[in-house]
């Protein structure tokens, strides 16, 4: 058999000066979006001035500069301040989450399962329904209890996301098989069946999450 000719490598154009700046912007953007960086802003409620100071510190480190003050004079007080902020935020956030669950539990349209999942089926969809081992395509929006959207297919061109139901948070594994193709469900997930004590990225630790999910397709 004749040898197959490999496809030509794609031609990558050199970046313009403006695009080079955008490339480094993206490097910084994705660095901060890593979970350990995103949690700084989430847990500490940084003001604009504090964000600016944080960026100044990063800029100095990138340029191999040294602080213009004695770090040892600041570090003990900084650790105390950060600890107090984290504890205060956790207490306030816990109260918000409890109040949200109480509101949901007072809504007779929601049902509750043994795991603590609260759900309301908006549209049941058609049979057959997926199983907990199925791979599905869904449209969805996820919010924290303060109404902030932390993830949504609407921000990605409204293209359905594909994933195996045994590879997502337990709340999804339990809830999505309740609907069929074309179905919609509103689910409220306590932290124990969501992202737990650690949180993830913009999601604070011990967060109750609200999802609206539409099942577009059962892939397999």
Residue ranges and their predicted role:
Residues 1-220:
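Cross-family detector of peptidyl-prolyl cis-trans isomerase
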């Amino acid at each position: 058999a004749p040898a197959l000719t490999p496809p030509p490598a794609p031609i990558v154009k050199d970046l313009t000066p403006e695009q080079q700046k955008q490339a480094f912007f993206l490097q910084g953007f994705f660095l901060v979006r890593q979970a350990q960086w995103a949690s700084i802003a989430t847990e500490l409620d940084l003001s604009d001035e504090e964000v600016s100071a944080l960026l100044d510190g990063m800029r100095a480190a990138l340029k191999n500069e040294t602080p213009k003050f004695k770090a040892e004079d600041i570090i003990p007080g900084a650790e105390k301040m950060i600890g107090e902020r984290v504890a205060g935020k956790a207490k306030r956030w816990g109260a918000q989450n409890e109040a949200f669950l109480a509101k949901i539990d007072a809504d007779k349209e929601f049902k509750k399962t043994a795991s603590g999942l609260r759900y309301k089926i908006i549209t049941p969809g058609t049979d057959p329904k997926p199983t907990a081992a199925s791979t599905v395509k869904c449209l969805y929006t996820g919010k924290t209890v303060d109404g902030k959207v932390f993830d949504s297919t609407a921000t990605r061109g409204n293209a359905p996301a594909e994933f195996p139901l045994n590879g997502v948070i337990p709340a999804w594994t339990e809830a999505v098989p309740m609907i069929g193709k074309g179905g919609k469900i509103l689910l409220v997930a306590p932290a124990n069946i969501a992202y737990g004590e650690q949180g993830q990225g913009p999601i604070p630790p011990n967060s109750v999450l609200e999802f609206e999910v539409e099942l577009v397709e059962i892939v397999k």
